[in-house]
């Protein structure tokens, strides 16, 4: 478990590729630079897609974990 306190939470539960990453893009865009976003997803492809998204756009994936088929991600938006 982590003690990160997110500035925003994206609940993509029940959504399948490409919806979680599309929603992630919108949420990150609306987040202040350096802000922390927690993403909750159930699509296993997010294990591949979200780290690639962060790497490609320069955001920091602080942590990812799985809890009973739910995937959790903590993403720090890059500074402008």
Swiss-Prot record:
Active-site residues, Swiss-Prot/TrEMBL: 17
Main location per the UniProt record: cytoplasm
Keyword hit for Cytoplasm: yes
GO molecular function annotation: sulfur carrier activity
GO biological process per UniProt: tRNA wobble position uridine thiolation
Domain of life: Bacteria
Keywords: Cytoplasm
Cross-referenced SUPFAM superfamilies: SirA-like (SSF64307)
Keyword Cytoplasm: yes
Single GO cellular component term: cytoplasm
Family, per entry: Belongs to the sulfur carrier protein TusA family.
Job description of the protein: Sulfur carrier protein which probably makes part of a sulfur-relay system.
HAMAP family: Thiourid_synth_A
Protein name: Sulfur carrier protein TusA
Organism per entry: Pseudomonas putida (strain W619)
